[in-house]
Amino acid sequence: RRLKICEKVINLESIDYFIFPDTKKRFQLETLRELNFSSNKILSSEKFRHLKAEELIITNHPYNFTDDPHYDAQHIPKWIIQWLKEKFLKNLKSNTKNYPKNIYIDRSDSESNVSHLRKIINEKEIIELLKREKFTTVRLGDLSFLDQVQYFNNAERIVGLHGAGFANLSFCKEKTKIIEFRMTDTGKVIENLADTNNLEFNSIICKPVSHALGAQLGHIKIPIEILDKKIKDQ
């Protein structure tokens, strides 16, 4: 998103080095590679704490609309989605892989340090129900970044627990059907993202079965009969 801002005013190829706050995660380096960034130009501010430069170019936040960062984070503008599609969908290679039309996002591979505090306690029942409805369970952490883009771009129905994986909704085709499981205080960032991308969004909102430790923490139990009805109504 910040690169989009830079592209409008400077030639990115003229930049000697790009400083990022973190490049530890696999998808970070993969996305930069797809954007044709040379690994020799990528610096992590965690490793390089003090730098000296003749010219330093810094971007502002790409969508700071108000003085409320919580509100701004939940209202991603359409131009960001359009830019992501423009940059990454064009890199998808035509292949014979048969991507599933219905996917369930399994978060058991989540690298979040609080993932153990946010689980679906009846997930086995959910997976059994979705399997009968021809859903394929997908662990995003097992996939490359471009494979994740392919899965979401080819999907017609997506179900999953609120989490960072839903950022890939940016790559969905219009009218893709979404069901998000979330707690009462999670916010509407995924719903707003789906709306901006013209997706058909639905949610199942649950109270935590145990004491919640924060807005996004606490185990939940999904009402199977409600999920079954929402799936059949799609």
Feature-to-residue mapping (PLM):
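The feature primarily captures lumenal catalytic ectodomains
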Residues: 1-234
